[in-house]
């Protein structure tokens, strides 16, 4: 870095504490002080903990834990179903508060944001004072608490917000980050996941300070380019700007996946679920003015074996049938019964040896609706136009009368597997840090 480039910046990272659970407790005050988690219905096998409140966390309940596991470690826990529309509304209200201090705001998921308040000091005060104001307003106006990190770059601002929770403000200024951050486990640094942590551990690197003092060349040899990036982060060399909200990286793919209420045991089961998911993917592509040129599926069986496969489409598409059929062909071509299990095949030829537990489908390699390409000479343009108009009509009907107002006949073959509105249930995931 050039000396002084990032020293003069003031970056905040604001993290809403136990966000989903905190919002729910505003609507369920009778549950305050009791263990609460937000997740899917416990009777549905795919339910996991999305957020737990601090009372539940003290019992050992963690984000990502299966609901049945959470119930084991905390028998008195109360599960609440997620309400994404409600959380998104609170997220937007939080952004409105942040907007009073800067236009340089970069959301990191639904409950976190970086703020560059460098230019706000004259009117609003220094970074610590702004963090205090934001913390106070979030409590008074939204009823939730935040942890805020104040630093000279994004990496240490994020580390500061993680440093102490809940309802805390932590500074990580240039003259103090070595004292505060270098003693922390290296896994606390952004982008040090489990696999990277194991590699660093094998190199004798336990803390952020160990990483900072390591040989950068050796790190690159072991971790590739990421080794150099992490070494720079540990030493405070991060000049990445806080992106304006409307300049974040464009959508690169649109997908949906699900763990079904019961195992998928036949080809028809898989086809039903793929069509449900493809309807959501295609509808969201149309809403955003995109078509996909590649379809990818992800499949996991009951023993958690999984594979991913993709195929290039003849023509870019946002048509449900084309996306679903491409995904179904990928599944048929790549999921096979073991050849040696003749007895099982003869007794139950229509069943898999290992039923499927979850499946996902994704449209990638996106182009805009006005992207021009030569249509395949063997394709029937009138039939394709008919499919497009049918999809658009279904969009209109569902928008007015609800998802279940019009359904494909295929869905009525299994009401358990088809009881899913994948588009409405879709969760928006965080933007990648590197764009």
Predicted features along the sequence, with ranges:
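Acidic, metal-coordinating catalytic segment for phosphate/diphosphate chemistry
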Residues: 315-435
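Short, charged/polar surface micro-motifs in flexible loops or helix N-caps
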Residues: 19, 42-45, 302-305, 366-369
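Short, hydrophobic beta-strand segments
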Residues: 113-119, 308-311, 368, 373-379
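A short glycine-rich, hydrophobically flanked beta-strand micro-motif that places a catalytic Asp/Glu
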Residues: 146, 150, 293-296, 359
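A residue-level signal for beta-strand positions that form part of recognition/binding surfaces
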Residues: 11, 35, 76, 251, ...
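DNA-contacting surface of Y-family translesion DNA polymerases
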Residues: 13, 188, 196-353
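Gly/Gly-Pro- and Ser/Thr-rich, intrinsically disordered tail segments characteristic of DNA damage-repair
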Residues: 1-235, 242-245, 283, 381-435
């Amino acid at each position: 870095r050039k000396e002084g480039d990032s020293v003069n910046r003031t970056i905040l990272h604001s993290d809403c504490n136990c966000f989903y659970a905190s919002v729910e407790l505003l609507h369920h005050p009778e549950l305050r002080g009791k263990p609460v988690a937000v997740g899917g219905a416990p009777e549905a096998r795919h339910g996991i903990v999305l957020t737990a409140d601090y009372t539940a966390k003290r019992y050992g309940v963690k984000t990502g834990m299966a609901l049945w596991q959470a119930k084991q470690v905390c028998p008195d826990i109360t599960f609440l179903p997620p309400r994404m529309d409600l959380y998104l509304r609170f997220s937007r209200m939080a952004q409105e508060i942040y907007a009073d201090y800067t236009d340089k705001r970069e959301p990191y998921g639904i409950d976190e944001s970086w703020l560059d308040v460098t230019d706000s000091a004259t009117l609003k005060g220094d970074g610590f004072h702004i963090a205090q104001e934001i913390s106070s307003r979030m409590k008074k106006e939204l009823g939730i608490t935040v942890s805020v990190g104040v630093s000279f770059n994004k990496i240490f601002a994020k580390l500061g917000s993680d440093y102490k929770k809940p309802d805390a403000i932590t500074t990580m200024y240039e003259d103090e980050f070595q004292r505060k951050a270098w003693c922390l486990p290296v896994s606390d640094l952004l982008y040090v996941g489990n696999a990277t942590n194991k590699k660093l551990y094998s190199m004798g690197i336990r803390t952020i300070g160990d990483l900072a003092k390591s040989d950068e060349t050796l790190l690159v040899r072991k971790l590739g380019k990421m080794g150099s990036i992490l070494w720079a982060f540990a030493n405070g060399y991060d000049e990445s700007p806080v992106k304006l909200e409307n300049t974040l990286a464009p959508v690169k793919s649109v997908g949906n996946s699900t763990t079904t209420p019961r195992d998928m045991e036949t080809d028809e089961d898989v086809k039903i679920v793929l069509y449900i998911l493809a309807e959501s993917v295609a509808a969201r592509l149309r809403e955003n003015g995109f078509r996909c040129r590649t379809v990818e599926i992800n499949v996991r069986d009951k023993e958690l074996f999984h594979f991913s496969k993709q195929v290039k489409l003849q023509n870019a598409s946002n048509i449900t049938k084309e996306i679903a059929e491409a995904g179904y062909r990928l599944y048929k071509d790549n999921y096979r019964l073991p050849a040696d299990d003749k007895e099982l095949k003869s007794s139950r030829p229509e069943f898999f040896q290992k039923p499927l537990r979850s499946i996902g489908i994704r449209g990638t390699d996106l182009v805009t609706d006005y992207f021009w390409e030569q249509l395949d000479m063997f394709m029937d343009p009138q039939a394709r136009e008919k499919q497009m108009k049918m999809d658009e009509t279904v969009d209109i009907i569902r928008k007015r009368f609800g998802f279940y107002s019009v359904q494909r006949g295929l869905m009525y073959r299994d009401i358990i597997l088809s009881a899913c509105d994948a588009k409405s249930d879709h969760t928006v995931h965080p933007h990648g840090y590197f764009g």
